Amino acid sequence: MNKRDYMNTSVQEPPLDYSFRSIHVIQDLVNEEPRTGLRPLKRSKSGKSLTQSLWLNNNVLNDLRDFNQVASQLLEHPENLAWIDLSFNDLTSIDPVLTTFFNLSVLYLHGNSIQRLGEVNKLAVLPRLRSLTLHGNPMEEEKGYRQYVLCTLSRITTFDFSGVTKADRTTAEVWKRMNIKPKKAWTKQNTL
């Protein structure tokens, strides 16, 4: 199967599902059997999964150390990963490793322990990110939570399982003008 055929078929493939496995560290995935669904996982000749979805929800992960290496061991084409579910873990930040998956379009991070709203800034480099969940994290309590995320990630179409409307975008832009100070352009006069 060539890469083009893989891209067309793997979206419909069942996810590589390690949810509800009490996994503490990413490296444990290598020795763990994924959950089985109604349809069997398709594998390459090398035994790696041909899916573009990785579900790690409802575990006890507190960091994503070695995520790239483990993804390479489990997936035939980790660079094509489009959906990662890390909901209901113990993550306290958005690990920069997630920003290396440029085909990522769905990212679930709800029900973790992410404190700082500024963590969302890391995700702005993901060109295909369309669906994001962050509710159930302490950051949700910060004033302007939804508006900040929508301003920072202007390409997302679904946030916290709700569609992003034109009214949401307008409200976010107004909020941005009222709350986020524009960066001053540095000029020689600033130093005088």
Curated annotation (Swiss-Prot):
Gene Ontology annotations for the cellular component aspect, listed alphabetically: axoneme
Note: LRRC51 and TOMT were originally considered as alternative reading frames, LRTOMT1 and LRTOMT2 of the same LRTOMT gene in primates.
Keyword Repeat (UniProt): yes
Chief subcellular location: cytoplasm
Protein localization: Cytoplasm
LRRCT domain boundaries: 137-175
InterPro entries per UniProt: Leu-rich_rpt, LRR_dom_sf
One Pfam family linked to the record: LRR_9
Name of the featured protein: Leucine-rich repeat-containing protein 51
Keywords: Cytoplasm, Leucine-rich repeat, Repeat
LRR repeats: 49-71, 80-101, 103-124
